[in-house]
Amino acid sequence: LKAMDPTPPLWIKTESPSTPWTNVTLLCVATNTEELSFQVWKDGELLSTLPVVGLVGKFWLGPVTADNRGIYRCRILTSENDWTPLSAPVEVTGKEPLPAPSLHAEPGPWILPGLETKLHCRGMLLGMIFDLYQEGEQEPVKSSQTPSAEATFIVNSTGNYSCLYRAPASAPSVNSTPSETIHVVIPDFLPKANFYILNDRDFRPGDIVTFSCWARFSEREYDLEFKLFKDGQETPVEVVPISDPMKVFFDLTAVGPKDGGKYSCRYRFRNGPPIWSEDSNVLELDLSTGQ
């Protein structure tokens, strides 16, 4: 299983959605119950260190003024006495329209039979309504109000999508700037994998050479099929599964001169259509002079 990312999310809680900058609290959310204290950073400098209460570190900003506008991040001290990575930056502007959300696709900006395509629209303020827009439509194609600062939309058609967030109906004039546009397509290929030699050194006949092929999906785990290629042709070889289903090892045992050549790998979704990734980067194995 994948290890949980310890990076905390940083959210903005407002007491009044209709006037979101009049009374603001920053919430730094812990990922487990053993975290001790947290730090708030503003514009790259440490601002404050405070205790975590429950799973949330709270830092009250109050009314947003010229003195406290800026880019905020947070991090948390764990029971192992290690600091987590800093959170993604959150901009406190005190102005409207509100800062644009981010929009990303999982597993990617594609429509593939058998796979669910999700668009994640992530803002910064809690208690907002998220709207998903498709180019050519005047009104949102989907809307969602969630307790967090992110909404997830499932899409089934190609097109150009963007999103924004807004205050609830009681304050309809408070909106964010739209996100960047994502182009959702039916792909010819999937993105190429990372490909490298695990025991990278000079090789001699009789050695074991282990290649690693890794598909770069960060949101979740998928059931993937991997293949190894030598000089552009599929090569039957032992596939070594590991705990991470997004990666495999290919073992070449007792290699000889015939195993020299240019290697690459590909992957595809087992439950999806027969669309493979582009060829990975190429690694050349030369058993006479070393790799």
Curated annotation (Swiss-Prot):
PROSITE patterns registered for this protein in UniProt: IG_LIKE
**Tissue range of expression?**
Blood and milk.
Which positions does UniProt annotate with glycan attachment? N23, N156, N160, N175
Q: How is it modified after translation?
A: N-glycosylated.
Q: Does the record carry Repeat as a key word?
A: yes
- Keyword Glycoprotein assigned to the entry: answer is yes
Q: Where is the Ig-like V-type domain?
A: 22-79, 114-171, 191-288
Q: Which GO terms describe its molecular function?
A: peptidase inhibitor activity
Task: List the InterPro entries hit by this protein, alphabetically.
Answer: Ig-like_dom, Ig-like_dom_sf, Ig-like_fold, Ig-like_Receptors_ImmuneReg
Q: Which GO terms describe its biological process?
A: immune response-regulating signaling pathway
Which keywords describe this protein according to UniProt?
Disulfide bond, Glycoprotein, Immunoglobulin domain, Metalloenzyme inhibitor, Metalloprotease inhibitor, Protease inhibitor, Repeat
Ranges that cross the membrane: none
Q: Which cysteines are joined by disulfide bonds?
A: C28-C74, C121-C163, C213-C265
GO CC, sorted alphabetically, is: plasma membrane
Q: What does this protein do?
A: Metalloproteinase inhibitor.
Q: How does it assemble?
A: Homodimer.
Official protein name in the record:
Venom metalloproteinase inhibitor DM43
